[in-house]
Design a protein with these regions (language model features):
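Short loop/turn motifs that recur once per blade in beta-propeller domains
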Residues: 188-189
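Serine endopeptidase catalytic core focused on the charge-relay Asp
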Residues: 1-50, 57-61, 65-183
Length: 189
């Protein structure tokens, strides 16, 4: 099964190095408005009604990206709800209105590179959420990063700060690491 069951997610909270510095997206609006704006295309996945992951729109067309360990088959994708705007409207406040569509077609997936590219049905409902691009450049040590996510299925959160390095911000610490294959991942804090 791809993704993680809710019980498994509750037990896997030790994947954060140091203090968990994720905050509701709205908590960063005053200090990092540009990073908050870049979180709009990020969505929560509900796979087969029980597994949770994060995905994001990539490019202006009907294209979504997630990890292969989240969605690895067309059958899973057809049973995946894609939730946009699943986040708090204010810092630690009430929930925003969520927009839901279903996964539609799997365009490409790769176990070793741990990605899945797919489309959604009713694309017009989510077109206004914008999109992210892809950066083909190699990551380098010290590059700043921001991490928008639905960790553990939570309303959208954003990690910008880190207690693991001198800059106080999230950054690339290992530019080339072994993921599911040799040199297929990047280590970050």
């Amino acid at each position: 099964m791809a993704g993680k069951d809710t019980a498994e997610q509750e037990m896997s909270t030790l994947s954060t190095c140091g203090v968990n510095e994720r905050k509701d997206v709205a908590c960063w609006e005053d200090s990092h408005p540009e990073k908050v704006a870049w979180t709009t295309p990020v969505a929560r996945l509900l796979i087969n009604g029980r597994s949770l992951c994060t995905a994001w729109r990539v490019g202006p067309d009907n294209r979504m990206f997630t990890n292969n360990h989240c969605v690895e088959s067309e059958t899973e994708l057809k049973n995946t709800e894609v939730w946009f705007n699943y986040q708090r409207s204010t810092c630690n406040g009430s929930m925003s209105t969520t927009v839901k569509v279903m996964g539609d077609q799997m365009l490409s997936t790769d176990y070793e590179l741990d990605y899945t590219l797919f489309t959604v049905d009713d694309f017009a409902k989510i077109a206004s959420f914008g999109y992210l691009g892809l950066d083909a450049s190699e990551p380098t040590y010290g590059d700043g990063i921001y991490i928008p996510q639905h960790g553990s299925g939570n309303p959208k959160e954003l990690a910008i700060e880190s207690d693991q390095n001198g800059s106080g911000l999230c950054q690339i610490d290992v530019a080339s690491a072994n993921g599911r294959g040799v040199n297929t991942d990047t280590g970050s804090v």
